């Protein structure tokens, strides 16, 4: 059976935590920031965990992580 390939775009966006879940950067913080409040931008700076229903998809994209 051939080797499974890692999706390189996913490898740049997701990191695995110690508990086996995946974390990523929040979206919506690249442009059009003037209409967004300081509170909203501050909360978008943090990391977020991938939802449980999407974890299987991310694991399939990152077979060796």
Curated annotation (Swiss-Prot):
Family annotation (InterPro entries): Ribosomal_bL35, Ribosomal_bL35-like, Ribosomal_bL35_CS, Ribosomal_bL35_sf
GO cellular component: a single term: cytosolic large ribosomal subunit
Region of interest: Disordered: 1-30
Pfam families, per database record: Ribosomal_L35p
Biased composition regions of type Basic residues, renumbered to the chain: 12-30
Biological process (GO), any one: translation
Record GO terms (molecular function): structural constituent of ribosome
Keyword Ribosomal protein recorded: yes
Record key words, sorted: Ribonucleoprotein, Ribosomal protein
Domain of life: Bacteria
HAMAP family, A to Z: Ribosomal_bL35 (MF_00514)
Record-stated family: Belongs to the bacterial ribosomal protein bL35 family.
Matching NCBIfam families: rpmI_bact (TIGR00001)
Protein name: Large ribosomal subunit protein bL35
Gene that encodes the chain: rpmI
